[in-house]
């Protein structure tokens, strides 16, 4: 996935009201841009840190700029636009890069399912039945270690999705939790027990129920981002 038009550079001044960020561009322009991330962005939100943003020409948009990438204190790049994750996964699925999910004959996005009024990110159809795939975007890293963690804030919605997947798996339906790790320099991912122990417990319960837990990393630059490798999942059990 190429960033088109090309991203512009700046430095972060502040993030506020969750969805807003003030930046200064390399030309000295002061802008308020959209922050497309509802998490805490623990290691992605350093005042004065380098950021990259896209700019839309849509006259209907109140804020033409969207925050796309941050440089972390450890010098990694993080794609903070969580809306990119599903597009990256679909691109990789169609290219056959997620080997565990190859062979599908149909792909649908945002399909209603479950008992708690959920929508699954992807339903993949196979000759022997469907697979339901939930995608989470991961950007949290600690102290320069090559292990990312999810979530970066308490997520009741994320735990709900795991319950829904576990219910499917118990009924004999293929259910998959896929972590798209949008952080460079990562080899593995784990649940962030110290941030949301409820989510970590729900993930372990989901896997015990038969949910497949996969993680894939990306190649990320200021020009493009794409899924390029499978990562290890560390559940601590």
Curated annotation (Swiss-Prot):
Gene Ontology molecular function, alphabetical: DNA binding
Transmembrane segments: none
InterPro entries, per database record: SfsA, SfsA_C, SfsA_N
Annotated coiled-coil segments of the chain: none
SS bonds (residue pairs): none
Protein family per UniProt: Belongs to the SfsA family.
UniProt name for this protein: Sugar fermentation stimulation protein homolog
Species of provenance: Pseudomonas fluorescens (strain ATCC BAA-477 / NRRL B-23932 / Pf-5)
Gene that encodes it: sfsA
């Amino acid at each position: 996935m190429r960033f088109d038009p090309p991203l512009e550079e700046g430095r972060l001044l502040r993030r506020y009201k969750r969805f807003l960020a003030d930046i200064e561009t390399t030309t000295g322009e002061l802008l308020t841009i959209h922050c497309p991330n509802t998490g805490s962005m623990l290691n992605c939100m350093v005042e004065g840190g380098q950021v990259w943003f896209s700019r839309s020409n849509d006259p209907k948009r109140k804020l033409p700029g969207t925050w796309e990438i941050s440089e972390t204190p450890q010098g990694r790049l993080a794609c903070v636009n969580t809306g990119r994750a599903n597009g990256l996964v679909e691109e990789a699925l169609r290219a056959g890069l997620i080997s565990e999910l190859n062979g599908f004959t149909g792909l649908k996005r945002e399909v209603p399912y479950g008992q708690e009024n959920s929508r699954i990110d992807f339903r993949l159809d196979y000759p022997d039945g469907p697979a339901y795939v939930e995608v989470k975007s991961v950007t949290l890293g600690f102290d320069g270690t090559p292990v990312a963690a999810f979530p970066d804030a308490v997520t009741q919605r994320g735990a709900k999705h795991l319950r829904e997947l576990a219910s499917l798996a118990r009924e004999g339906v293929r259910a998959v939790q896929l972590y798209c790790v949008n952080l460079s320099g990562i080899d593995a991912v784990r649940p962030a027990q110290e941030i949301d122990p409820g989510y970590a417990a729900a993930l372990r319960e989901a896997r015990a129920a038969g949910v497949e837990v996969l993680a894939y990393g990306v190649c990320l630059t200021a020009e493009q981002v794409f899924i390029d490798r499978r990562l290890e999942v560390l559940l601590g059990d």
